[in-house]
Design a protein with these regions (language model features):
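Catalytic cores of glycan-processing enzymes that make or break glycosidic bonds
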Residues: 1-490
């Protein structure tokens, strides 16, 4: 769906009846030093509703609109969703009292029940699409091409997730693992895909998404292309990204760990540690006795070992405690202290990101610590082939579905399989000049542009950076190094 905020109101049939109101609003908006997005979008939707209501008899009998709705099967679920969302004061569908999990038949009945309001949303989409297609046609005649963006993920509170629930895992969230900029990683809040279900439907949801985009774009960028290789997956109950794992990935198994001498009890201890009061004092300090009584219970069969109560078994629950932030931080350190993250299976184990420096690891004999180091490091090297296979399957669909030129956002640290797959599928890579440097050498020299992949989009900046002029003015920017690089390139 398109954003009605970009509709040219004065070009909409029937707008002349409200010419004075439109001109007055336009003059008011143009006086502002900034684009008042919320105010403008609210006004546009309101004036579009006035135009729609005033022209309703003509609109509901418009054969072109009727045909457009029939050809775009996403339109009815989307319009029903928008109508219900308005009726529920824009609340998430998860908070609605009715219609939270509809099937196709129910969507059809709701379209009929709320036909006028649904038709209003369909009409806005039709108008927006016609205007966009006209603009693309005019630009094409000038010899220019339009490049769009295809985000890999979808907001949970969306028509797609509401209507096509089977394609999404609401028990998980996508994000990014910890790095030098974020100790706890990132939790983006978007549900992950159930790729097995999507594949059973011959990737129809993705094919339709690309077909819609191809109406407007000559080329498109795959945002976070690494997510088609593997996505950092976090349980929905968590807040940060620290307790995630890559999906898909080759897990450690009970057979491997048992073969190395680890028993069930030891592995459970490494996944869900238990503590003595003295050990907890190392985390909780002067609050130990109070917090043990409040947040912990005895390990079954013991009187002197403690585990977290179920009420404090997630980041959300810990951060919701009515305690000072310092206490919450200490409780999080207890919660994060593990070698393996919970998986819901006794036979599958994913290492915690910081497994190698956790206090629980150091309670093991040195020989067992060494075994775990060897096993986990070997497992890390086993992932590349799986990720290459997964990306080839998924990206082949995207690359071959339309005639749009495909570009990838492959910035940052990428697995070795990424350039291999992009080259095989003729998907363009991305190079941002200021970041295309050899960071392992003294002064981090810029790469010669002749070293960039032949199939790549090269630019001095992007939406995540300042402009080139802005970069030049940054106080810590090495102008001499960049100037030498620029002159070397001619």
């Amino acid at each position: 769906a398109l954003n009605p905020a970009f509709i040219n109101i004065q070009s909409v049939a029937g707008s002349s009846a409200f010419e004075g109101e439109i001109n007055e609003a336009k003059e008011s908006f143009e006086k502002s030093d900034r684009v008042e997005y919320y105010r403008i979008t609210t006004w546009k939707r309101a004036i579009l509703r006035k135009i729609f209501d005033n022209s309703y008899d003509q609109i509901r009998h418009d054969k072109s609109l009727t045909t457009w709705i029939e050809r775009n099967e996403w339109a009815k679920p989307y319009c029903v969703y928008c109508t219900l969302k308005q009726q529920n004061n824009e609340a998430s569908w998860k908070d609605w009292s009715d219609y939270r999990d509809p099937d196709a038949e129910q969507v059809g009945k709701l379209w009929t029940k709320f036909r006028k309001d649904c038709l209003y949303h369909a009409w806005m989409q039709y108008v927006a699409e016609m205007q966009f297609c006209t603009a693309v046609s005019e630009v094409s005649q000038m010899g220019l091409h339009i490049k769009g963006d295809i985000p890999i993920l979808i907001n949970e509170d969306s028509a797609d997730v509401w209507a096509d629930r089977k394609y999404f895992s609401l028990a998980d969230r996508a994000g990014a693992p910890p790095d030098m900029f974020s100790y706890a990683g990132q939790n983006w809040g978007f549900p992950t895909y159930r790729w097995d279900v999507i594949e059973k439907d011959n990737f129809s949801w993705w094919r339709k998404r690309l077909a819609q985009a191809s109406k407007f774009y000559h080329a498109y960028r795959i945002d976070h292309v690494l997510g088609f290789f593997r996505i950092w997956t976090i349980p929905e109950k968590e807040v940060t990204g620290i307790l995630g794992h890559f999906e898909p990935s080759v897990p450690l198994t009970w057979d491997v760990l048992h073969g190395a001498g680890f028993c069930r009890q030891s592995l459970e201890y490494l996944r869900n540690p238990n503590y003595s009061v003295d050990q907890l004092r190392g985390f909780l300090g002067d609050d130990t006795e109070r917090l043990v009584a409040k947040c912990f219970e005895n390990l079954p069969g013991t009187t002197d070992r403690f585990i977290l109560r179920d009420e404090y078994s997630s980041e959300k629950q810990i951060l919701a405690m009515e305690e000072p932030q310092a206490v919450k931080d200490a409780m999080l350190r207890v919660y994060w202290n593990r070698v393996f993250i919970p998986t819901g299976s006794d036979d599958v184990f994913y290492p915690y990101w910081y497994w190698y420096n956790q206090p629980v690891l150091y309670t093991l004999p040195q020989n067992e610590q060494d075994k775990l180091h060897d096993i986990i490091h070997a497992n890390e090297h086993a992932q590349n082939a799986l990720w290459e296979q997964n990306a080839m399957k998924l990206l082949s669909v995207l690359a071959n579905e339309t005639d749009m030129l495909v570009c990838a956002e492959d910035l940052g640290a990428v697995p070795p399989c990424v350039p291999t797959v992009l080259n095989k599928l003729n998907i363009l890579s991305l190079r941002i000049e200021r970041w295309a440097r050899n960071w392992n050498m003294q002064y981090s020299p810029y790469y010669d542009m002749e070293e960039y992949p032949r199939l790549s989009v090269c630019t001095t900046s992007c939406h995540d950076t300042s402009t080139l002029r802005g970069l030049w003015k940054e106080p810590d920017f090495d102008r001499n190094l960049y100037w030498a690089h620029a002159h070397q390139m001619g």
